[in-house]
Design a protein with these regions (language model features):
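Accessory carbohydrate-recognition regions in carbohydrate-active enzymes
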Residues: 14, 148-149, 196, 241, ...
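Active-site core of glycosidic bond-cleaving carbohydrate-active enzymes
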Residues: 8, 51-222
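Short, surface-exposed helix-loop/turn micro-motifs enriched in polar/charged residues
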Residues: 2, 24, 153, 221-228
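A general structural signal for short secondary-structure junctions and capping/turn motifs
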Residues: 22-24, 29, 111-114, 201, ...
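Surface beta-strand/loop "capping" patches
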Residues: 227-247
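Single conserved hydrophobic/aromatic residue that forms the stacking wall/gate
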Residues: 1-14
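Acidic/histidine-rich catalytic neighborhood
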Residues: 13-67
Length: 247
């Protein structure tokens, strides 16, 4: 009974995800609009194709098809069409991924660089996929590293950056992101991720830190590098147990 209930709930969710995406006949693609993006400076009603959400849609719909096959059902052809035609991440003339397809001033307007750099979550929290060019994502990471308004970030932004750097083969940045000396990257003796006097407990930071460390140690499916999130400079003796690779 439990398995049937879980399967039913997942089916409802996956059908919603398919129905939520809009087919753009002119562009022969599916787009995401009207969602509340992780980057909170974006307007939900007007935002088109935020990158983290696009990548998550691609990943989640693939998992939905795998679950159908495990349940003995055929793949949903409409879902496969969505997976095949989902919009790639939008970028500018400098090869930098935008905060959203219609956020053309991402790297000029300080509002866009004073919040979660959610674009990094598209590869890091999630695996690399066909919507993303690795060279453009590396460009984006470097620009964010050098220019972001880090004083306006939140606790989970640092582990998200570390996971992105790990998957892009930048272990030095992964470690430095977790150790960055910023107020919102502070952990108190009791373990809480301090943000400010108003917000002394911030669990997304704790969860992000644990997830980032696990990825940096155990890697991900198909990763052949030992401890991929730590520099190979002879200064690290990494020991861990009981962790599984991420997707």
């Amino acid at each position: 009974i439990h398995e049937r209930l879980v399967g039913s709930e997942m089916c409802i969710r996956d059908r919603f995800m398919y129905a939520f995406a809009t087919y753009d006949e002119l562009g022969v693609r599916f787009i995401l609009k009207g969602a509340i993006p992780a980057q909170e400076t974006l307007n939900a009603s007007t935002t088109i194709n935020p990158p983290f959400e696009l990548s998550y849609w691609y990943f989640a719909m693939q998992i939905a098809q795998i679950w159908r096959e495990r349940a003995g059902e055929k793949r949903n052809l409409e879902w496969d069409e969505l997976i095949d035609k989902l919009s790639p991440l939008a970028y500018n003339e400098d090869g930098l991924y935008l905060a959203a397809e219609n956020a053309i001033d991402t790297y000029k307007d300080i509002r866009f660089t004073s919040d979660h750099m959610a674009v990094l979550g598209a590869v890091g929290i999630l695996p690399m996929n066909k919507l993303i060019r690795e060279d453009y994502m590396k460009n984006t990471l470097q620009w964010i590293w050098d220019n972001w308004n880090w004083g306006k970030t939140w606790g989970w932004d640092y582990p998200m950056t570390a996971m992105n750097a790990t998957r892009l083969g930048e272990p030095e940045k992964a470690v430095e992101a977790l150790l960055m000396n910023k107020r919102t990257n502070t952990y108190l003796p009791n373990g809480h991720n301090y943000q400010d006097p108003r917000l002394r407990v911030y669990l997304p930071g704790n969860g992000g830190l644990l997830t980032a460390i696990a990825l940096m140690c155990a890697g991900w499916d198909g990763c052949e590098i030992e401890n991929p999130g730590f520099p190979k400079n002879g200064k690290w003796n990494v020991m861990w147990e009981g962790l599984s690779p991420m997707p």
